[in-house]
């Protein structure tokens, strides 16, 4: 069997649809999805097998990254640093831009990335045909920069094989790097953590999801049930009260929603215990961020 394998960094501005694309390719709910921008905070490896037209069985290891953005808060700097690291580690990059975006995001990407890349224009199902053609024409001025230009819709599964074909074409022949049926090398407790975070974005408004995070305190994995003990961390006591809600109604909704998604992903029953704590300025303190698993690479220039 002829095989290829390689790491592919998936880069884009917030809300470009990176996580939706990966979940569609995997036919599973692993990457956090929200209609709110900047939901993804940590790099996640997602493994997609694909047989290309040349007969290669390719193992495409996508590096799902936080959206490219610049803010002074240390948490946001951690997120940007992970996206930059993924670009450096990958053999190939895919820059995903919404059909509704201007060209500034792609121009910023070009200033940051020296790796070969594919430009993918997403959400074409949300625009009329003329608008899609116009956007593709605008990107043609950069034709010497990208390997291929692929319009697609993750929601409608349009042109996804074309994207995978382009990626596989530019990967080097190699033995597979992971087991055949593995979709991610993430630990299940880390996937569960992201599911809880997704529920925060689903049920809380305004700034609270952006000023909150989740810590798994204890994870017990049994044959028929996973037991998850976690706490939600916010920055203010007033936010804690909102997360809990009157008579605990909000935390119950968040917990139920998260638990059902966990059971779907883990394919077993899940017991979930959620607590809420307030810790002022946690998103600005390096030690607090390290405890939550964030890595900040300082610029040493």
From Swiss-Prot:
Positions that bind GTP: 12-19, 64-68, 122-125
G2: annotated span: 38-42
GO molecular function, one term: GTP binding
Ranges where the record places region G1: 12-19
Protein location: Cytoplasm; Cell inner membrane
Main localization of the protein described in the UniProt heading: cytoplasm
Gene Ontology terms: cellular component: cytosol; plasma membrane
Positions of the UniProt region annotated as G3: 64-67
Domain KH type-2, residue spans: 204-280
Membrane topology value: Peripheral membrane protein
Region (G5): 152-154
InterPro entries: G_ERA_dom, GTP-bd, GTPase_Era-like, KH_dom-like_a/b, KH_dom_type_2, KH_sf_prok-type, P-loop_NTPase, Small_GTP-bd
Pfam families: KH_2 (PF07650), MMR_HSR1 (PF01926)
Record-annotated Era-type G domain positions: 4-173
Annotated spans, G4: 122-125
Cited PROSITE patterns: G_ERA, KH_TYPE_2
Keyword annotations from UniProtKB, A to Z: Cell inner membrane, Cell membrane, Cytoplasm, GTP-binding, Membrane, Nucleotide-binding, Ribosome biogenesis, RNA-binding, rRNA-binding
UniProt subunit comment: Monomer.
Listed NCBIfam families: era, PRK00089.1, small_GTP
Family in the record: Belongs to the TRAFAC class TrmE-Era-EngA-EngB-Septin-like GTPase superfamily. Era GTPase family.
Protein name: GTPase Era
Organism: Helicobacter pylori (strain Shi470)
Lineage of origin: Bacteria, Pseudomonadati, Campylobacterota, Epsilonproteobacteria, Campylobacterales
Name of the gene: era
């Amino acid at each position: 069997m002829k095989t290829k394998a390689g790491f592919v960094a998936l880069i884009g501005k917030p809300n470009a649809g990176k996580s939706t694309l990966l979940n569609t390719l995997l036919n599973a709910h692993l990457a956090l999805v929200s209609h709110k921008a900047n939901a993804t905070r940590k790099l996640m490896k997602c493994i997609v097998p694909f047989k290309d037209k040349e007969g290669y069985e390719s193992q495409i290891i996508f590096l799902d990254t936080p959206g490219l953005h610049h803010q002074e808060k240390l948490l946001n700097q951690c997120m940007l640093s992970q996206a930059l690291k993924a670009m450096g580690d990958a053999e190939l990059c895919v820059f995903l831009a919404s059909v509704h975006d201007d060209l500034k995001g792609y121009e910023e990407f070009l200033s940051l990335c020296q790796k070969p890349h594919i430009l993918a224009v997403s959400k074409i199902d949300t625009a009329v045909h003329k608008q899609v053609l116009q956007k593709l024409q605008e990107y043609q001025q950069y034709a010497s920069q990208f390997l291929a230009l692929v319009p697609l819709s993750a929601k409608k599964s349009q042109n996804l094989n074309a994207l995978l074909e382009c990626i596989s074409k530019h990967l080097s022949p190699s033995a597979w790097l992971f087991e055949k049926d593995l979709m991610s090398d993430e630990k299940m407790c880390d996937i569960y953590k992201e599911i809880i975070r997704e529920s925060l974005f689903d049920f809380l408004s305004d700034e609270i999801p952006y000023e909150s995070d989740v810590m798994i305190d204890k994870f017990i994995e049994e044959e028929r049930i996973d037991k998850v003990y976690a706490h939600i961390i916010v920055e203010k006591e007033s936010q804690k009260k909102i997360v809990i809600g009157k008579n605990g109604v909000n935390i119950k909704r968040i917990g139920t929603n998260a638990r059902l998604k966990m059971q779907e992903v883990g394919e077993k029953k899940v017991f979930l215990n959620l607590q809420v704590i307030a810790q002022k300025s946690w998103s600005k303190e390096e030690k607090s961020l390290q405890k939550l698993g964030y890595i900040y690479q300082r610029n040493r220039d």
